[in-house]
Curated annotation (Swiss-Prot):
The keyword Lipid metabolism does not apply. Disruption phenotype: Embryonic lethality when homozygous. GO terms for cellular component: Cul4-RING E3 ubiquitin ligase complex; nucleolus; ribonucleoprotein complex. Gene3D superfamilies: YVTN repeat-like/Quinoprotein amine dehydrogenase. GO terms for biological process: acceptance of pollen; embryo development ending in seed dormancy; embryo sac development; rRNA processing. It comes from Arabidopsis thaliana (Mouse-ear cress). SMART domains: WD40 (SM00320). Pfam families: WD40. It is found in: Nucleus, Nucleolus. Component of a nucleolar small nuclear ribonucleoprotein particle (snoRNP) thought to participate in the processing and modification of pre-ribosomal RNA. Essential for embryogenesis. Plays a critical role in embryo sac development and gametic cell fate. Required for the correct positioning of the first division plane of zygote. May function during early embryogenesis. This is U3 snoRNP-associated protein-like YAO. Keywords: Nucleus, Repeat, Ribonucleoprotein, RNA-binding, rRNA processing, WD repeat.
Length: 504
């Protein structure tokens, strides 16, 4: 017979069909277990009674069985789709906000119980937050910054043995990260200053993670870190330096997880695209590489610079901003592998950052801070001598901060190099730092930047990071510049300094 050699699965079904038939009648198939549906009404949402029920524990013995012997039901939301989960979480968030507003009214003894007004208020606040996060509207923080008191100032919260070259903050402003020239990578708490050190794994582990070791190899030199970036979700930390690799670390465990090879020279700058796991890396080999940290994969490569790339920045869009020693700023359209070129009058652009998708800020090696717009290939506004280094015994008479004065010595010292510029994301508040003894705050206006205050800080300011709230500023400072030893300030302290900002 045709089916004699086939293995029978389960018993045969004899109800209503032919006796001994192996084919199952769909009518008698076991009905699949249906997922419990959650009702989403405008006003009422079914919620669990306790934390235990919410986590799926409703009583039973230690083996997970119910006391009455019944099998525990599956999690209520185990089979929900991604869309259903987003809807459920959104409804829960709205309910929490409505409840918070009701409590505020009760505390204020307000008898008005209009839920429609609450919903309208919540709608406006959520819309404004979304527009601020996406960069469509600008938060006006600069006008709220008050003049620092005499007691205010930078205080060192994390110490390093050598110059700090890069700092970064987590998206919630609670944790900070710093890297120095001696290869030390630190993870620290902003409020308490408690530090944790990232430990470099052995060569065998690095090799298994994708690193290509070169011989002979000086460990102290090869681990010199020059760049650092943290993902917006706080999961990954990326570092790079003279070993030509991009190293990925797990922030939760502080363990090394991946080493990306590919650059042919020192990795000089790193940044994550906000809200994603895409990482952009710039190098002295004049290329920008794009990586997917989650998938541990290389995506693409962008060219355009004719000199070493010194700084990079990115926002939400697939766009990258880079500057280099070829006196150009490049706006990379990553998916298309195209670029827009902006030329600067300075001999070298040292730093850059996005203000918005259409505006950028740059710092150069002659103490100039410039504002750029997407539609003009030259700076929209140039503030000269923003960090001019004035030698001892020389007065400032005749030196115009934003004038046409040219210093007697055209070869500006390393103290005036604007090594760092930063903005409070989505706002009109910016800062710049050099080695001339202070960090400068700026207000970004329409086609102009206006100086606010000078915050004294001794040393080369190699990196800056604003808190998202705008309530404090972090600076990576050291006795030497970011790249090389073009200057030395023995009175400076190597470390991370924090300065509180008082907002009106």
């Amino acid at each position: 017979m045709k089916y004699n050699n086939e293995k029978k699965k389960g018993g045969s079904f004899k109800r209503g069909g032919k006796k001994g038939s192996n084919e199952r009648d769909p009518f008698f198939e076991e009905e699949p277990k249906k997922r419990r549906k959650v009702s989403y009404d405008d006003d009422d949402i079914e919620s669990v009674d306790s934390d235990a029920e919410e986590n799926g524990f409703t009583g039973g013995d230690e083996d997970g069985r119910r006391v009455d012997g019944e099998v525990e039901d599956e999690d209520e939301f185990a089979d929900e789709t991604a869309g259903e989960k987003r809807k459920r979480l959104a409804e829960e968030m709205l309910n929490r906000r409505r409840e918070a507003m009701r409590r505020e009214r009760e505390e204020a003894d307000n008898d008005d119980d209009d839920d429609e007004d609450d919903d309208e208020t919540i709608k406006k606040s959520l819309m404004q937050k979304q527009q601020e996060d996406s960069g469509r509207i600008r938060r006006l923080i600069a006008s709220r910054v008050q003049e620092p008191l005499s007691t205010d100032g930078f205080s060192v919260i994390v110490k390093h043995r050598r110059s700090v070259v890069s700092v970064a903050l987590s998206d919630d402003d609670s944790r900070g990260f710093s890297a120095s020239k001696d290869g030390t990578i630190m993870h620290w708490d902003v409020s308490s200053g408690k530090t944790d050190k990232y430990i470099w794994p052995s060569d065998e582990i690095l090799k298994s993670h994708g690193m290509k070791l070169r011989e002979p190899r000086n460990k102290n030199h090869s681990r010199e870190s020059l760049a650092l970036a943290v993902s917006s979700d706080g999961r990954y930390l990326a570092t790079g330096g003279v070993d030509r690799h991009v190293h990925i670390w797990d922030v939760r465990t502080r363990e090394h997880v991946q080493a990306f090879p590919g650059h042919r020279n020192t990795v000089s700058c790193l940044c994550f695209r906000y809200g994603t796991s895409e990482l952009y890396s710039g190098s002295f080999d004049r290329t920008v590489k794009v990586w997917n940290v989650e998938d541990k994969a290389f995506i693409t490569e962008n060219h355009g610079h004719q000199g070493e790339i010194l700084a990079i920045d990115a926002l939400r869009k697939e766009r990258a901003l880079t500057v280099g020693r070829d006196r150009t700023m490049l706006y990379h359209k990553v998916p298309e592998s195209t670029r827009m070129i902006y030329r600067a009058p300075a001999s070298s652009l040292e730093s850059c950052c996005f203000i918005s998708d259409n505006e950028y800020l740059s710092g150069s090696d002659n103490g100039t801070v410039a504002l750029w717009g997407m539609l003009k290939k030259k700076p929209v506004f140039v503030f000269k001598n923003a960090h001019q280094d004035i030698p001892d015994g020389i007065t400032t008479n005749g030196i115009l901060e934003n004038g046409d004065h040219e210093p007697v010595n055209n070869n500006c010292s390393a103290n005036s190099w604007v090594n760092a510029v930063a903005t409070s994301r989505g706002s009109d508040l910016a800062a710049s730092g050099a080695g001339n003894g202070f960090v400068r705050l700026w207000a970004v206006e329409t086609n102009a930047i206006r100086p606010l205050y000078e915050l004294p800080l001794t040393g080369f300011v190699n990196s800056l990071a604003f808190a998202k709230s705008g309530k404090f500023l972090i600076a990576g400072v050291g006795q030497e510049t970011r790249f090389g030893r073009w200057g030395c300030l023995k009175s400076a302290q190597n470390g991370v300094a924090i300065h509180p900002l008082r907002l009106a």
